[in-house]
Amino acid sequence: MLKVGILGSTGSVGSQALDVIRKYKDQIKVELLGASKLSENLINQIKEFKPSYVYVENAEEKSIDDIKVLVGEDGLRRAVNLDLDLFINAIAGIKGILPTYLLLKYNKTLATANKEAIICLGELLKDKYKKILPIDSEHSAIFQILKDSNQKEVRRIILTASGGPFVNMPAEDFENITVKQALIHPRWSMGKKITIDSATLMNKGLEVIEAHYLFSMPYEKIDVLIHPESIIHGMVEFVDGTVISNMSNPDMKIPISYALFYPERKFLSDNYLDFTKIKSLNFLKPDTEKFPLLKLAVECGKKGGVYPTVLTVADEIAVNYFLEERIKFTDIHKIILETLEKFDYNKLDSVDDIFYIIDKTINLATEIAKKYGST
């Protein structure tokens, strides 16, 4: 019986992980569920899966139905120290950084969809990344292709992007994009923050940085292509000209299942590709004039140091302001760029430095976002 813990169980990825586990309750025991608050959704999950422990960021309860409730940072440290076979970090955004750090520090096997943690922890924990099973569809695709390959044989890896809802919209119309429009993703069902990042192509830029660390791949060997059908999730081109791709219908449960049962594969549904119904597979170079955040993210990745962390945190602040309808869609790029230009701290020698940089960036980006919100 595989013993699993899920942090962020009430979010999009966490909920889909539980959907997979429901099919294999005879093989998987959920020992830990975690969320930011003791919501009705979490309580229903507790009743169904009956974990031994529950982690909640903020709560007064000490137990629920005789299940131990772990609260706050002390509770988190206890949760990640549990003797489990696999932890899934499905926490969205920068809140997922501390759990990732602790899990890697304690040498736990980690399946993660939290790219922010990989990007911010960067070089400091790169020797630990071999313990990670990626859940992002693109990184899972590359992971599956590369696992039996020698990196010297790789010419480049290619991450695909749907292009988001605005790939065919004229740039001059971007200023009037609404939150409702930006949250309608053409292919994937995801959380709000990552859906906005997909609309700006920031998500793909962050994925380039993540791929650099996860696969020890030079930036010069990482390419991005717009692929509107979202059938091919990633490709690896080898030095002999061979290209191997990972293809499936767009469904997050597939990479989640692969991480859960690695190295085995399990039946999920009859939602197989019907190649006779695929009329075409299209690939385009991303327009970085129209979507400048993709280019900015890659530039920050190449610079290294504090830049990837500042970029990541500033993006989260700006996206939240947009989701609250306090700024325009086009202000997201402006806020991130101004935060990067005004950030004045360069020391990055320890994990403590990372958390200091995060706090400092939150304050600076919030101050800048408020300025745009008042115009």
From Swiss-Prot:
EC number(s) stated in the UniProt entry for this protein: 1.1.1.267
Highest taxon in the source lineage: Bacteria
GO BP term, example: isopentenyl diphosphate biosynthetic process, methylerythritol 4-phosphate pathway involved in terpenoid biosynthetic process
Catalytic activity: 2-C-methyl-D-erythritol 4-phosphate + NADP(+) = 1-deoxy-D-xylulose 5-phosphate + NADPH + H(+)
Alphabetical keyword list: Isoprene biosynthesis, Manganese, Metal-binding, NADP, Oxidoreductase
Cofactor(s) listed: Mg(2+); Mn(2+)
Binding site for NADPH: T10, G11, S12, V13, K37, N114, E116, G191
Any GO molecular function: 1-deoxy-D-xylulose-5-phosphate reductoisomerase activity
Metabolic or biological pathway: Isoprenoid biosynthesis; isopentenyl diphosphate biosynthesis via DXP pathway; isopentenyl diphosphate from 1-deoxy-D-xylulose 5-phosphate: step 1/6
Residues the record lists as binding 1-deoxy-D-xylulose 5-phosphate: K115, S137, E138, S162, H185, S198, N203, K204, E207
Any Pfam family the entry gives: DXP_reductoisom
InterPro entries assigned to the protein according to its UniProt record, in alphabetical order: DXP_reductoisomerase, DXP_reductoisomerase_C, DXP_reductoisomerase_N, DXPR_C, DXPR_C_sf, NAD(P)-bd_dom_sf
Residues bound to Mn(2+): D136, E138, E207
The keyword Oxidoreductase is annotated on this UniProt entry: yes
Record's function text: Catalyzes the NADPH-dependent rearrangement and reduction of 1-deoxy-D-xylulose-5-phosphate (DXP) to 2-C-methyl-D-erythritol 4-phosphate (MEP).
Family: Belongs to the DXR family.
Full protein name: 1-deoxy-D-xylulose 5-phosphate reductoisomerase
Species of provenance: Sulfurihydrogenibium sp. (strain YO3AOP1)
Gene: dxr
